[in-house]
């Protein structure tokens, strides 16, 4: 039972990572369909450059340029866990167990605009810079069940201490009987959670053509974050005893844990860029500074208390016909008092720590890391364009709650390459690849919020409707690697359990966009 409060932590942090993303830990880089079909756009000159290569946009023709993009994304997350206490779940006594979450974002819009005049380009961009959907875990997570399973063991241990004290004065064992907690740590519970994250980004930039070959840009992005987290763990039963009966038997929901938290915050990202083109080559770079972001909580959370545990155990004794004096003698036993006192102290301390991050009115650190993008483009002939790119995200210096970023080995590194070919005057086909490598340590991995390194492959094309309009279509799939970890849990001073976890994801994105020149 001293572990019960930690379920609250699990609920409250399950959706700390991005829902739908291509990029770093908190950065979406799939902001135009051209990326979805080619993967490498850092050195391309086009309307998508408003995000990928803002300095290069100034080399487009004079006039107005507009891009309208729509994406649909579906992602699954799965964690296989072989924790040894899971067979005690009377409703699902299987190990290893796979816990699965699903995220579906049917509409992810983005818009880019540029007006070029002379040596100047004035640009704007609206997109989801982070998040982008809702993720559901219909049956909870392994960390949830792990804590409930340990709660069941703790309840049985306390029951044993109480019954041992009762036996010393001739009373029969009550709480370790199979009609109450039993001795095996059997349990059941219901759990659900969902989370939603949207980081809206609106940027403005200016690019200037220094020479016919060199351009620079400067801009700023405003970010507004809005998040919602809801989850619960309820109907916890240990053996045949509903847990609420020893916490507050007058309220069936007294053992339930519920999180309902809305978060919002805003920040600003300065952005600079440079582009240099010579002959068949183009070189470009962009740097986004760190975004300081503080999320303010608006929460209505419900958590259990075990402050009345002794009184409720006493009431159970008396209701079973035990004289008040005998019940008082059992519960005043030094071992029983010590066990309940330690239980309450651990519970209250950990519950305070758990509530801290999602306390109503509190502001939580959630910085978006600095981001460097470098690209090279080469055009061997007019009909063929080849791009390669590199990304670096400074994740270790983007402050998050409890300085979790310090557990990373390094920031995220990405490499990409893409090619597009004009097969006819009306049709362009393209494909691309991107490798994403996170600086993950074993300590950083957590089924409540995780990423794993991956390779993404894209295909798509452009239909040139006329000289003013181009239709982009794309699909990309992300092949995630598996991250395996091992952990040892100390249940008691003399008992420990080791278990393994296997983390992975699956991601599919479809996209359609229209580029307009006028």
Residue spans for each PLM region:
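N-terminal, post-signal peptide beta-strand-biased segments of exported outer-membrane/organellar beta-barrel
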Residues: 17-137, 143, 149-150, 156, ...
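Residues that define the transmembrane beta-barrel architecture of outer-membrane proteins
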Residues: 48, 104-109, 198-202, 264-270, ...
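Residue-level signature of outer-membrane beta-barrel architecture
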Residues: 58, 115-117, 208, 222, ...
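Repeated loop/turn-to-beta-strand initiation elements of outer-membrane beta-barrel proteins
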Residues: 64, 119-122, 213-216, 280-283, ...
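Transmembrane beta-barrel strands of outer-membrane/channel proteins
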Residues: 68-74, 124-128, 218-222, 285-289, ...
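Solvent-exposed loop segments that connect transmembrane elements
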Residues: 84-94, 140-190, 226-261, 295-360, ...
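Detector for outer-membrane/organellar transmembrane beta-barrel domains
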Residues: 273-295, 332-348, 352-439
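Outer-membrane beta-barrel "beta-signal"
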Residues: 461-463, 504-518
